[in-house]
Amino acid sequence: MIDMETIRAAAARLVAAATSPTRVILFGSYARGTADEGSDLDLMVIEREVPDRAAEYMRLMDAVGRIAPGVGVDLLIYPLSEYERRGQVPGTLLFEARSEGQVLHDALP
């Protein structure tokens, strides 16, 4: 398992590397406080625009790097417009992250 200091450091690396970061959200078991030794780290990056999601994903995964032995990273990237639209729909991952996630970076007014 990893601690919040390690998670916040990973989020800071994402913010530094992202093209137009508006929000970084921790979701899943680490956000709920139910993480165990087999848990991965679920992070969502919201950017103003994401013209090439695949390229941005590769850049951000490189920036996050290896968190800790045996800890995988699930990284999701969404443009702000999609986050705002689909984050209102119950049952979606965006809704879960928006309602239960922990915001680690917020540049929205």
Could you describe each region identified by the protein language model?
Residues M1-R23, R32-E37, E47-P109:
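Catalytic core of pol beta-like nucleotidyltransferases
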Residues D42-I46:
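Short beta-strand->loop micro-motif that forms the acidic, two-metal-ion catalytic signature
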